[in-house]
């Protein structure tokens, strides 16, 4: 037992643990025969009660910990596999109800991103990004709980309500709101003298997540404010219509009530999309696109992880800087064919994703979609 607990429990504490975990029910409760009960090494060498994480530097018994069962961090797609990679081979200690330490792989409490859902990919397939024309009069539009089809920073607004105003001067503004979760604003301008160019600035305030990453228990509560700039350019080359769009952003993270995360540095983000389309005289259209979903390319978290205890009951730990840059870079190469059919349009599409979810070791993924759209 001294080896199991790495000599962090004194002989007296080990004996007390054996007494506390001994079987005392039924006939084993007869103190005249069994004294402290029937010794149970299995119970003595396994967590007693629900283990909890304590902050490094705290004292056992003098502070409340975070239950191990509810301590995890679920990563958004922009962070990919960054934290599991940073915590690879790193141990973290949790303490049971009797104060004994037990060690676990820290990366086991991170949940890497699953990437965009099938429903989100289908929405993007059915409604590919298109720049609206400059209106001749002021236009207003409201969408409740709108699906975000964007692959950039506005992908974070999925499920938020949108109110858009667009004017004949090429100026447009959109307000985003999702109760208790997010609010944001974008301002865009398309110069009348250069209608092929659009510039946009945006602000998003996430209250309960950081780039769609959510923490719980010892990882605390994450939030973040994002500022981003984007530019888009349209042009024609023969029968082809070409589009290019890029975004860069900076995220100012916040973390509270965490035993593990001390601070998170500002995060730099980016995304881009290149597209080409060719319409045909019969109404068909062929489209190609290459895009990178939103990705963090600089930033780190300062962590203080509990790694054990002293025999006097003080929690000891280690500090480290965990880079939040994913190991890979997802690139989506898509092709789509739209064909008129039965008073509507039949769409066939395929996407090949390399290093999906920004994970360098992940095998390429293929996605195929078929859709039909008609209006009456």
Region roles according to the model:
Residues 136-153, 157, 258, 299-314, ...:
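A subset of solvent-exposed loop/turn segments in beta-rich extracellular surface proteins, enriched
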Residues 44-134:
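Secreted peptidase-domain scaffold signal
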Residues 105-248, 360:
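Outer membrane beta-barrel translocator domains of Type V secretion systems
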Residues 28-49:
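Caspase-like cysteine protease fold
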């Amino acid at each position: 037992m001294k080896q199991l607990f790495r000599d962090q429990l004194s002989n007296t504490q080990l004996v007390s643990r054996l007494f506390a975990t001994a079987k005392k029910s039924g006939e084993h409760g007869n103190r005249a025969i069994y004294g402290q009960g029937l010794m149970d090494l299995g119970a003595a060498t396994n967590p007693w009660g629900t283990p909890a994480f304590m902050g490094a530097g705290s004292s056992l018994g003098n502070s409340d910990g975070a239950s191990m069962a509810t301590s995890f961090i679920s990563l958004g797609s922009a962070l990919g596999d960054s934290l599991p990679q940073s915590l690879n081979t790193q141990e973290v200690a949790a303490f049971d109800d009797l104060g004994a330490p037990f060690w676990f792989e820290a990366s086991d409490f991170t949940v890497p991103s699953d990437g965009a859902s099938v429903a989100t990919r289908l929405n993007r397939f059915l409604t590919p990004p298109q720049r609206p024309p400059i209106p001749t009069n002021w236009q207003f539009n409201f969408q409740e709980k709108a699906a975000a089809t964007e692959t950039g920073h506005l992908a974070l607004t999925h499920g938020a309500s949108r109110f858009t105003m667009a004017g004949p001067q090429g100026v447009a503004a959109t307000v985003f709101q999702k109760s208790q979760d997010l609010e944001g604003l974008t301002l865009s301008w398309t110069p009348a003298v250069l209608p092929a160019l659009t510039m946009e600035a945006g602000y998003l305030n996430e209250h309960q997540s950081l780039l769609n990453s959510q923490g719980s228990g010892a990882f605390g509560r994450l939030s973040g404010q994002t500022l981003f700039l984007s530019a888009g350019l349209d042009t024609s080359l023969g029968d082809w219509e070409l589009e290019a769009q890029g975004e860069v952003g900076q995220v100012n993270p916040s973390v509270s009530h965490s035993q593990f995360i001390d601070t998170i540095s500002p995060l730099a983000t980016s995304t881009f999309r290149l597209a080409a389309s060719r319409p045909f005289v019969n109404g068909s259209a062929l489209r190609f696109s290459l895009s990178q979903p939103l990705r963090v390319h600089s930033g780190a978290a300062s962590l203080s992880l509990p790694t054990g205890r002293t025999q006097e009951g003080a929690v000891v730990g280690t500090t480290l800087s965990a880079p939040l840059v994913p190991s890979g870079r997802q690139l989506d190469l898509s092709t789509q064919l739209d064909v008129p059919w039965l008073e509507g349009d039949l769409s066939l599409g395929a996407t090949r994703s390399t290093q999906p979810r920004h994970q360098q070791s992940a095998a390429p993924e293929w996605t195929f979609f078929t859709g039909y759209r008609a209006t009456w």
